[in-house]
């Protein structure tokens, strides 16, 4: 469940496998769904076992499959690389030493789709004695639009000799937000888990729901936030980027230091001018597969000084810093893979902000003392939407404030339930966030 310490448990299990269970690092494989997750696991493992963590294979599904195919990833091939790798394993076209594993660890197993499941099954078939440790939460499967299906995690749990363990202790949230989340889960059917989550904290916490008649709820949400602001971290969660941008403008109008967790609207991180400059600088001067320390520092200095006025340079600096932390030796192929699999939001630093604004999708995996959710009644109330709301609800550590014009929360026990029948307007000043898609290149033709 959320806040149960899944990441901590997995990291300690990895350390135990290596140090206590005599599993050699080359026999251990961990697969994740994002470069950010792979990096976090590597960082945490380094804190536990030191430099030995550098030799543990922690990869995304895509990067592992590109390794099996013997080439560096690109955007076109990434669409079918997992299914291709699974097919090659089944047909015996992959070198045995590349797939010979005794332990396979899968993070966020609820996000597996048909291709990832086929890969896991292929590895299991080729390694009959291989242990599979899959950790996930079917209630947090919010990527169905990408083909994920928690049913595949359930299939693994049904394998002969498998053990199913429910992690129901929540160390993140106070009692009232956890009880509220448990009640909300009754909206979701066909769940794998059956045991309610239990808060391990003594604090009661607070849950407040405000039901509106108005279509627009931006102004009262901000007023509510101003009224309840505390010293801790606060986050406003929305359904769409458009809602997030409107709330950002309104918060700044009230003088609140706020930051948004955002993407570049389809622009890949490796296509940013600052990142391309850094890669190109190294590519033109590198003599061997290994990036020398001198060349690395030279590339940093030149890139950072060239783009010192760029607001996007902070993403590149964060990327370079994380790669340095998790790679003892810097191979250019590894760095290109690291960059290719990363996204802008992976390096979005929201520290120092009084309020963070984000869509629910981008806030997954994060936590905040206070959470304010904007829930519009404009969407079909299916299981996918309910799981998305559940992810938002479980980001709150202490207090949860829900602003809605729908009826999803009417039946739940809360500390305060308010009805607001006033009509609110769309904010007079809104911010239109432009991206590269809004540039008309034809305008510059003579």
Tell what function each PLM region has.
Residues 1-74, 182, 394:
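P-loop NTPase Walker
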Residues 213-231:
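Conserved interdomain hinge at the start of the Helicase C-terminal
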């Amino acid at each position: 469940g959320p806040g149960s310490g899944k990441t901590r448990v997995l990291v300690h299990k990895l350390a135990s496998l290596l140090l206590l269970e005599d599993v050699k690092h080359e026999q251990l494989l961990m697969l994740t769904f994002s470069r950010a997750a792979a990096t976090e696991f590597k960082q945490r493992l380094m804190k536990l076992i030191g430099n030995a963590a550098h030799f543990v294979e922690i990869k995304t599904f895509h990067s592992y499959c590109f390794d099996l195919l013997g080439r560096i990833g690109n955007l076109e091939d990434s669409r079918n690389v997992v299914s291709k790798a699974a097919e090659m394993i089944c047909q015996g076209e992959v070198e045995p030493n590349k797939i010979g594993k005794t332990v396979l660890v899968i993070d966020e197993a609820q996000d597996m789709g048909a291709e990832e499941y086929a890969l896991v099954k292929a590895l299991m078939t080729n390694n009959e004695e291989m242990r599979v440790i899959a950790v996930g939460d079917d209630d947090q499967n919010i990527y169905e639009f990408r083909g994920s299906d928690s049913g595949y995690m359930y299939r693994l749990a049904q394998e002969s000799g498998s053990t199913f363990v429910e992690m129901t202790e929540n160390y993140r949230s106070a009692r009232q937000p956890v009880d509220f989340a448990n009640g909300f889960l009754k909206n979701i059917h066909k769940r794998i888990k059956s045991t309610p989550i239990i808060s391990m904290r003594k604090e009661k916490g607070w849950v407040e729901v405000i039901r509106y008649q108005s279509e627009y709820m931006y102004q009262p949400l901000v007023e509510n936030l101003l009224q309840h602001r505390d010293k801790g971290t606060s986050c406003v969660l929305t359904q769409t980027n458009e809602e997030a941008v409107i709330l950002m403008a309104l918060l700044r109008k009230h003088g609140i230091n706020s930051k948004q967790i955002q993407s570049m609207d389809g622009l890949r991180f490796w296509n940013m001018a600052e990142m391309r400059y850094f890669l190109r600088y190294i590519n033109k001067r590198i003599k061997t597969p290994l990036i020398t320390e001198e060349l690395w520092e030279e590339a940093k200095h030149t890139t950072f000084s060239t783009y010192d006025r760029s607001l996007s340079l902070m993403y590149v600096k964060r990327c370079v810093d994380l790669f340095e932390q998790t790679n003892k030796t810097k191979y250019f192929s590894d760095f290109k893979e690291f960059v290719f699999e990363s996204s802008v939001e992976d390096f979005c630093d929201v520290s120092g902000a009084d309020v963070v604004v984000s869509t629910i999708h981008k806030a997954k995996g994060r936590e905040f003392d206070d959470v304010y959710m904007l829930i519009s009644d404009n969407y079909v109330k299916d299981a996918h939407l309910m799981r998305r709301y559940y992810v938002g609800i479980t980001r709150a550590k202490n207090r949860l404030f829900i602003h809605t014009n729908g009826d999803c929360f009417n039946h739940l026990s809360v500390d305060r339930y308010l009805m607001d029948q006033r009509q609110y307007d769309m904010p007079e000043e809104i911010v239109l966030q432009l991206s590269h898609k809004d540039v008309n290149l034809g305008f510059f033709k003579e």
